[in-house]
Amino acid sequence: DQTDTDLEEGAMKVILVNGSPHPYGCTYTALMEMANTLNAEGIETEIFQIGTEPLAGCIACQNCAKTGRCVFDDRVNEFLDIAGSADGFVFGTPVHYASAAGALVSFMDRAFYTDLRSGRQLFYLKPAACVVSARRAGTTATFDQINKYFTISQMPVISSRYWNMVHGHTPEDVKKDLEGLQTMRILARNMAWFLKCKEAGIKAGVPFPEREEITFTNFIR
């Protein structure tokens, strides 16, 4: 689901993941507000729909450590195949029982764990943001939940002037949430600014942070 762009070849790219079972619902409406703003800033965008097919949770089989791919060959592997070409990510979700949609949780659990165990480093130092859509409540708990994937993966988290949420029962409702849509536009501009700063830093020869071998310490030994 590619957004229409008129951008230069080689432009930086942000993948926006729609974690809703509704491909063109409230979450999509918020993501498109961001996508259009990113395009205006010269950033290419792609909407990735996780779809409505059942997505299994991680079964800790460690197949990803051996093959670099999840043992369940579905939308997770399709996403990981294109993630390397992205410069930034946005993950959008509706609120279900004051938390993220179950399918998106399974999707992100497996995507991020596969990346960790395989050593592919598809997300390392790439900016990320989450977008949350609700009819009424549960948004901040869901916002915190999704951000935890980024902050355990060395991904700079992009913020806006308010927590990244929109409200509405239908896409038409979301379009009336003027503050929510403004929050999406500011979020997109902040991400575009960060991407341009990162690109300028790399071109200027600013080195990436020194890497350390990861140390694991179990609480109970």
Model-based region annotation:
Residues 44-53:
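A short beta-strand-loop structural module common to alpha/beta enzyme folds
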Residues 156-221:
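Glycine-rich phosphate/pyrophosphate-binding loop and the adjoining helix
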Residues 1-11:
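Short, Lys/Arg-enriched N-terminal segments with co-localized hydrophobic residues
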Residues 53-80, 216-220:
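Cysteine-cluster motifs in flexible loop/terminal segments that predominantly coordinate metals
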Residues 13-41:
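N-terminal beta1-alpha1 ligand-phosphate binding loop
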Residues 71-162:
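Helix-loop-strand module that forms the ligand-binding subsite of alpha/beta enzymes
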